[in-house]
Amino acid sequence: MALGLEQAEEQRLYQQTLLQDGLKDMLDHGKFLDCVVRAGEREFPCHRLVLAACSPYFRARFLAEPERAGELHLEEVSPDVVAQVLHYLYTSEIALDEASVQDLFAAAHRFQIPSIFTICVSFLQKRLCLSNCLAVFRLGLLLDCARLAVAARDFICAHFTLVARDADFLGLSADELIAIISSDGLNVEKEEAVFEAVMRWAGSGDAEAQAERQRALPTVFESVRCRLLPRAFLESRVERHPLVRAQPELLRKVQMVKDAHEGRITTLRKKKKGKDGAGAKEADKGTSKAKAEEDEEAERILPGILNDTLRFGMFLQDLIFMISEEGAVAYDPAANECYCASLSNQVPKNHVSLVTKENQVFVAGGLFYNEDNKEDPMSAYFLQFDHLDSEWLGMPPLPSPRCLFGLGEALNSIYVVGGREIKDGERCLDSVMCYDRLSFKWGESDPLPYVVYGHTVLSHMDLVYVIGGKGSDRKCLNKMCVYDPKKFEWKELAPMQTARSLFGATVHDGRIIVAAGVTDTGLTSSAEVYSITDNKWAPFEAFPQERSSLSLVSLVGTLYAIGGFATLETESGELVPTELNDIWRYNEEEKKWEGVLREIAYAAGATFLPVRLNVLCLTKM
């Protein structure tokens, strides 16, 4: 049976191909042509039967004017678009690009050619981006294509804070704006962002446009979930906004929200229509009072402005992000829960990770063979984590492969600092590679004052700090320097009290804390703290065990220490380096380290970052 169906399908495709090829051949050789399509200054000879078979629009035109069926004038359609449509009807081939797809989409809608329409929808969906999502959304609404409009709206909601800054956002109609901001899928951490976007929209345009928008503002306001706004913001910003104060109806809505904050919920009666209203007057007199009250209660609805359903973006949590070659796992120390973020094996084993102040996560390291670069094909992986799709995105590879380097960020740039070459000789480096996040290009930055590897790089207030490590003589360094990208210069700071490499370090409570690591005499458990304002180092509570490669993470005001390597004695009495996967927390009040978890399996071979992630995008483990 299956073979029969397969054979029938094969025969059908063969006949379709034969028919289409034959029609195209007759078109190319000018055989049996009985129609001319005119668009602008160009003429396109073709076959009426082909147009009528593929398009209800053309069929209706031919049947409505049989005496003029040999000539068809198409107004307001460019000749190039007509040429592409006709080429597709005869060949099933169409060349889409960013410049032509919207015109082809509109033509397919007008001429009622569903196949071209579907191809354009798929093309636009796959290429949705910040620069075109609003235009695609409006196009989907204009052409009544729900699939495209919904896809574009979902993209806008996912990137709302960025899209709301676009000038095209201010050109939305009231209905288009409501379709976006009424969505539960809006990716905003705070409702304040929605309010501010609506106010910018209402105050934009010329005087006539502003007047029209302000008339629509009470309706638009129903989609702003003011009940999610803090009481202080409601009173200081919303209630005092000039556009709100100018409309008594908006002030009444704000008062309803303030009452709701105090526990007094306002409800509205649901309006009855037609017979329901008339029938209510003739209601059975024997209906009990309790039943009447129940019906009345059922007819009451909550005003839209009192909607307190959380948006998609409001499920962000501060988590410890553990990145390894096996995948990425997020750990919530407050609830002692783990979430799977990604099972991708794209991350190289020997990597360095970084989270920017905008909460973007990057990974660099490993070896990548770039076939396009004939002169120097060896480079390093450079990846960015996509929070929405929970996957790693390949970025332009790092041109200078190295190990034992550090990552820092400042002013929209990411810095790869120092390290050792992954080449013969493993030369120590003082070079600094700079990745521009706006142009997506690598370049060289100002070199370090000295060569270093096994150091730590930290970022704070658009400055890049380099601490410790080892020099070309393999001796540990206590040096510390800072790079100011505004001045394009490195400056040496006060040195650490203990020279060390492969240690843990983080910025915590405005200070830099370093702990454990390797010294010239072995492992250490010592820790010290650096005052950025005073440029001074002071002792800090030592870690309970001597370790190297300890990771320090500052998360929501709490300092954590994770993993690392310690020298442990085996059953045979031999001392061997052993990786530990435990988690410790520093007790600020008692000034001591406390154990949190003896072992967390996902920490093996991982790097650790404090990241804000949406738990709705993650899978609880």
Swiss-Prot record:
Annotated ranges, domain BTB: 33-98
PROSITE patterns in the record: BTB (PS50097)
Keywords from the named record: Cytoplasm, Developmental protein, Disease variant, Kelch repeat, Nemaline myopathy, Repeat, Ubl conjugation pathway
One GO MF term: ubiquitin-like ligase-substrate adaptor activity
Residue ranges constituting the BACK domain according to the UniProt record: 133-239
Ranges of Basic and acidic residues composition bias in the record: 275-292
GO biological process terms held by the UniProt record: negative regulation of proteasomal ubiquitin-dependent protein catabolic process; negative regulation of protein ubiquitination; positive regulation of proteasomal ubiquitin-dependent protein catabolic process; positive regulation of protein ubiquitination; proteasome-mediated ubiquitin-dependent protein catabolic process; skeletal muscle fiber development; skeletal muscle fiber differentiation
Effect of residue 500 to C: In NEM8; uncertain significance
Signal peptide (residue range): none
InterPro entries in the record: BACK, BTB-kelch_protein, BTB/POZ_dom, Kelch-typ_b-propeller, Kelch_1, KLHL40_BTB/POZ_dom, SKP1/BTB/POZ_sf
Region (Disordered), start-end ranges: 265-295
TM ranges: none
Subcellular localization, as worded in the UniProt entry: Cytoplasm; Cytoplasm, Myofibril, Sarcomere, A band; Cytoplasm, Myofibril, Sarcomere, I band
GO cellular component, one term: cytoplasm
Kelch repeats, residue ranges: 360-412, 413-462, 463-510, 512-557, 559-613
Disease: Nemaline myopathy 8: A severe form of nemaline myopathy. Nemaline myopathies are muscular disorders characterized by muscle weakness of varying severity and onset, and abnormal thread-like or rod-shaped structures in muscle fibers on histologic examination. NEM8 is characterized by fetal akinesia or hypokinesia, followed by contractures, fractures, respiratory failure, and swallowing difficulties apparent at birth. Most patients die in infancy. Skeletal muscle biopsy shows numerous small nemaline bodies, often with no normal myofibrils.
Function: Substrate-specific adapter of a BCR (BTB-CUL3-RBX1) E3 ubiquitin ligase complex that acts as a key regulator of skeletal muscle development. The BCR(KLHL40) complex acts by mediating ubiquitination and degradation of TFDP1, thereby regulating the activity of the E2F:DP transcription factor complex. Promotes stabilization of LMOD3 by acting as a negative regulator of LMOD3 ubiquitination; the molecular process by which it negatively regulates ubiquitination of LMOD3 is however unclear.
Family note: Belongs to the KLHL40 family.
Protein name, per record: Kelch-like protein 40
Organism encoding this protein: Homo sapiens (Human)
